[in-house]
Amino acid sequence: MSQPTTLYDKIWNDHLVHEAEDGTCLIYIDRHLVHEVTSPQAFEGLRVAGRKVHAPEKTLAVVDHNVPTTDRSKPNPDPESAEQIAALAQNARDFGIEYYNEFDKRQGIVHVIGPEQGFTLPGTTIVCGDSHTSTHGAFGALAHGIGTSEVEHVLATQTLIQKKAKNMRAVVDGKLPDGVTAKDIILAIIGEIGTAGGTGYVLEYAGEAIRALSMEGRMTVCNMSIEGGARAGLIAPDETAYEFLKGRPKAPKGADWDAALRYWETLRSDDGAHFDHEIRLDAAKLPPIVTWGTSPEDVIAVTGKVPDPAAIEDEAKRLSKERALHYMGLLPGTKITDIRLDRVFIGSCTNGRIEDLRAAAKIAEGRTVNGNVSAMVVPGSGLVKEQAEAEGLDKIFTRAGFEWREPGCSMCLAMNPDKLKPDERCASTSNRNFEGRQGFKGRTHLVSPSMAAAAAIAGHFVDIREWR
């Protein structure tokens, strides 16, 4: 009888090409997603070496990081961004790669469009020159970010050199209370393990609460695996995943679908499989969460108060948290609901999908954005935007005073025109609250879409569970 195996081990073993004596492995890569920021040097390396892209049909390119989310008929105001976008278009033509430019309705954030097109499939290995590639693990794919030199290696060989990670599992049982979402689950997990807690691991999410999530919710959870230090996040595929993928443009069809389904149904951790580390959370006890500092591990219930670092015994950690409070312009003991806001951003590869926009629109409908707040909604892709407009969500947002934008990474990161000004405070549905992440001296609080929408209307954080 074979030894029980984890989901990660199964996918890894299916893609292992060679293992050296020191544990260094060569694994086959099924899918490669490419964007404009981390690919120019990789393509130039191929040119210099006289190499072709090994498997262009397994490579998909899209612009997302640098594209403006306003009127795209006008020239890009940033020459460097415009150059990177033009370079990706040229590289896609030269190397025969499918490419979604900024005028293609299929364009969007790379981690939104992959699943949307059915390019992301269970049991595959997926890489991209972007740390949030872990998003695709929601489908039971082994997906993680790579560096630019590795982008070139995958383009040239369709393989990747790395060492195998350890197995970790986060089990979330129970039922989420009303107003508590997938975003709160992953923030709670990161708060529990810290931003280094998953280092050296691939993190599988399991349990009743995870199973109850939609695919959008599962993508939110897996998206932030890297914020917990993990190389990748995984959720075993099930009927929810199959239903999402069936009929997608790049998903298998007919007999190929039936064959794929038979394989996908084997993709789960066996009973008794060994995990090197495991944590457990009770979903029923989770509150809506807000980050207060400059690390995703700096989490607090919306009903809580900004903590006092003086109670931290470890000097390095205490100094780090004191610096975070100074940067954020907050005092210990401040009620989270007393924190007033300047900006609200709803979007990103964490929370820019149709379910996220519906949740925010439900809060915004019939209400008005606070006069002291500038709020924007940025769909994760052109197809999400199209669906939202078909449902009238854009009208709900614009009537309430939100800006309705074109798809892209937008204010998640300060690499395009959507940026915070110094000392502006933002409630954001994105994934990182680092110093300067959304703009020089910008102050970021991570929250769910419904929490962000409510904060935009109130002008400060509110407990969404009490929203009327």
UniProtKB/Swiss-Prot annotation:
Top-level division of the source organism's lineage: Bacteria
PROSITE patterns hit by this protein: ACONITASE_1, ACONITASE_2
Enzyme Commission code: 4.2.1.33
Pathway stated in the Swiss-Prot or TrEMBL entry: Amino-acid biosynthesis; L-leucine biosynthesis; L-leucine from 3-methyl-2-oxobutanoate: step 2/4
Alphabetical GO biological process terms: L-leucine biosynthetic process
Function: Catalyzes the isomerization between 2-isopropylmalate and 3-isopropylmalate, via the formation of 2-isopropylmaleate.
Chain residues that bind [4Fe-4S] cluster: 349, 409, 412
SUPFAM superfamilies on file: Aconitase iron-sulfur domain (SSF53732)
The name this protein goes by in its record: 3-isopropylmalate dehydratase large subunit
Subunit structure: Heterodimer of LeuC and LeuD.
UniProt KW keywords: 4Fe-4S, Amino-acid biosynthesis, Branched-chain amino acid biosynthesis, Iron, Iron-sulfur, Leucine biosynthesis, Lyase, Metal-binding
